[in-house]
From Swiss-Prot:
Belongs to the AgrB family. GO terms for biological process: proteolysis; quorum sensing. It is an enzyme of class 3 (hydrolase). This is Putative AgrB-like protein. One of its GO terms (cellular component) is plasma membrane. The chain crosses the membrane at residues 49-69, 88-108, 114-134, 148-168, 171-191. Its main location: membrane. It comes from Lactiplantibacillus plantarum (strain ATCC BAA-793 / NCIMB 8826 / WCFS1) (Lactobacillus plantarum). Keywords: Cell membrane, Hydrolase, Membrane, Protease, Quorum sensing, Transmembrane, Transmembrane helix. One of its GO terms (molecular function) is peptidase activity. Pfam families: AgrB (PF04647). May be involved in the proteolytic processing of a quorum sensing system signal molecule precursor.
Length: 200
């Protein structure tokens, strides 16, 4: 788990960057919330990305890992979803998942093209229903922002559904798995609602 002083340093850096941007751009409240969320996300993700990319290079799996990571992170940026409370555990699981899944898929024949497309469309339905999955870590009060994120999540899922036709079988399978991973992180765990505070 991260030391308190390390977390404090990240919070201070985030606040300073946000204050500088806010001072120069005079953002509206909704825009300011998105910028702050973006800064926090980037500062939390960078260490995980570095570790993941190093492992991918060691296993000679950089392109598949980047495809998996990119498709997941783009969609998750709109769908939101649960987070682990421990940064250390999150870093370990991130590296294992982003590197392990593409590495294992290379030893399979992948999923047939038409079946991949059907799976993508089937996954788009619950992703559209439950996005954005608001949590304690990422609360969203604005209904207009929720609607905008929901629409973007649906459009992104549909784009990936067609994009998987343009790549190799293994890369197409990786895109499908990225949608599946997003789905597992936004599907409700308690009470039938995806935006409950209990769904960390």
């Amino acid at each position: 788990m991260e030391k308190p002083e390390q977390k404090l340093l990240l919070y201070k850096l985030s606040d300073r960057l946000f204050a500088a941007i806010q001072k120069n751009l005079q953002l509206e409240r909704r825009q300011a919330l998105l910028v702050k969320l973006g800064i926090d996300t980037v500062l939390n993700v960078i260490p995980k990305l570095i570790i993941t990319i190093i492992l991918a290079l060691l296993l000679h799996e950089l392109v598949p890992v980047l495809v998996f990571m990119g498709s997941f992170l783009v969609l998750r940026g709109f769908a939101y979803g649960r987070h682990l409370e421990s940064d250390l555990l999150c870093t370990i699981l991130t590296a294992v998942t982003f590197v392990g899944v593409p590495y294992l898929i290379q030893f399979t024949d992948g999923i047939p093209e038409l079946f991949r497309f059907i799976l993508c469309l089937l996954l788009t339905v619950p992703i559209g229903m439950f996005s954005p999955a608001v949590t304690r870590k990422n609360p969203i009060k604005s209904q207009s922002l929720k609607r905008a994120l929901k629409h973007k999540a649906i459009i992104t899922s549909l784009v990936f559904s067609f994009l998987q036709f343009l790549v190799s079988n293994n890369l197409g399978t990786i895109i499908v798995v990225s949608l599946l991973l997003v789905f597992t992180l936004i599907v409700p765990l308690k009470g039938g609602k995806s935006d409950e505070a209990e769904n960390v």
